[in-house]
Amino acid sequence: MANAIIETAKERFAQSHQSLSREYASIRAGRANASLLDRIQVDYYGAPTPLNQLASITVPEARVLLISPFDKSSIKDIERALNASDLGITPANDGSVIRLVIPALTEETRKELAKEVKKVGENAKIAIRNIRRDAMDDAKKQEKAKEITEDELKTLEKDIQKATDDAIKEIDRMTAEKEKELLSG
């Protein structure tokens, strides 16, 4: 039962890391990357649909994304969704494909994005600490219910803390990597 607490916490830590990774992928670093468009939803026949289900997204040049809709009639809907997004990039529609030219980042923009990366990283650490708190509470409940001994509780708390420390180190690594990518341009 004690192992189940740690395994559950580790699974939740991994989910937090995946979520952070997706969040960082959507922060543009001055280079074209199809993952920039992962969170774009297009109103397609009245239903919000992920852009990558309506079009192929390619990177023909370092700072250009090419969006080729599978259904040419959806091009206006895709363009509308891109304009409404918070990307800050104006789409160029030539009737059959949409081009997104990623502007070069200014030094000021890079610093702003680096601040955003730190903030997102801090939020991920808070989530990790909340998971740790839940795991510690579960362990204490088991000890109160006499399912584990006091010594087992102490060992379990140490294991939970070690897993938490490892998860936070991984967040720090991911954050430093993304900041370096942004600031090195």
From Swiss-Prot:
GO MF terms here are: ribosomal large subunit binding
Q: Name one Pfam family in it.
A: RRF
Which InterPro entries does the UniProt record give? Ribosome_recyc_fac (IPR002661), Ribosome_recyc_fac_dom (IPR023584), RRF_sf (IPR036191)
A GO BP entry:
translational termination
Cellular component GO terms, alphabetical: cytoplasm
**Domain of life where this protein originates:** Bacteria
Keywords from the named record: Cytoplasm, Protein biosynthesis
Compartment list: Cytoplasm
- Family, as annotated: Belongs to the RRF family.
> What does this gene product do?
Responsible for the release of ribosomes from messenger RNA at the termination of protein biosynthesis. May increase the efficiency of translation by recycling ribosomes from one round of translation to another.
Q: What is this protein called?
A: Ribosome-recycling factor
Native source species: Streptococcus pyogenes serotype M18 (strain MGAS8232)
Gene from which the chain derives: frr
